[in-house]
Amino acid sequence: MKKTTISYSILTHNETDSLLKLIEFLVKHKDEEDEIVILDDYSDNPKTKEILDVMCSMHNITFDQRHLLKDYAGQKNTLTRMCKNDYIVNIDADEIPHKSLMKNLKPILESNPTIDLYWVPRVNTVDGITQEHINKWGWNVN
């Protein structure tokens, strides 16, 4: 039986520390047959460029650049076409999947082969958040 494979897809633009943490996490927790795919909106932050150059070459990450030009759907569609595996997990550059998700994702996918789409709830954790931030960004805390 063929192994289930996953493409972890990430859109980026000038992310730095969070992107590095995400890549390091995925490299550590993904299976060997899985891939990391990054589409960058021509980041102009030198630190972001360095992270992408180093991490993509060190870890055989599929990487390309495309101008967003207010076309988020086109950006996501381009990223999707870059992915080669059975399933795609879209991750924001400032998110880290839970370790239990990484461990249990393939068994869940393999035991439900007729399901094409999964919704994964997430918990946002923001260091140093204040009520002012919550009000400014229109977040709900519940």
Residue ranges with predicted function:
Residues 73-80, 98-142:
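Catalytic-site signature of metal-activated, phosphate-bearing donor transferases
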Residues 1-28:
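N-proximal low-complexity "stem/linker" segments adjacent to membrane-targeting elements
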Residues 88:
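Short aromatic/hydrophobic "clamp" motif used to bind/position activated sugar donors
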Residues 92-96:
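The conserved acidic donor/metal-binding loop of glycosyltransferases
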Residues 23-65:
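Acidic donor-binding segment of Leloir-type glycosyltransferases
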Residues 25-29, 54, 78, 82, ...:
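A generic secondary-structure signal
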Residues 65-72:
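Short, acidic/glycine-rich phosphate-metal binding loop used to engage nucleotide
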